[in-house]
Amino acid sequence: MQIKHLITLFFLVLIVADQCSAFLSLIPSLVGGSISAFKGRRKREISAQIEQYKDLQKREAELEELLDRLPMY
């Protein structure tokens, strides 16, 4: 093999090994996150979501009102 092929192969193996080690270190956190999601520990409060939606609707109405008051150019 020529040296340029060996260098290319070396860098390819280096990149693949780095990506695999990064993926393997993520597995424990993925398992823990999926278990807590299935058990429902991270359920959001529906009332908080409703309040956020109402606030968003209010801001949107205020923005439309403000834009209606601006003169057209």
Curated annotation (Swiss-Prot):
The keyword Manganese does not apply. Residues 1-22 form the signal peptide. Residues 45-73 form a propeptide. The keyword Nucleus does not apply. Its main location: secreted. It comes from the Eukaryota. Has a low antimicrobial activity against S.aureus, E.coli, and C.albicans (MICs 120-160 uM). Has a low hemolytic activity (4% at 160 uM). Also inhibits the growth of two cancer cell lines on a total of five (the squamous carcinoma cell line H157 (IC(50)=55.9 uM) and the lung adenocarcinoma cell line H838 (IC(50)=52.5 uM)). The modification Lysine amide is found at residue 39. GO terms for biological process: defense response to bacterium; defense response to fungus; killing of cells of another organism. This is Antimicrobial peptide TsAP-1.
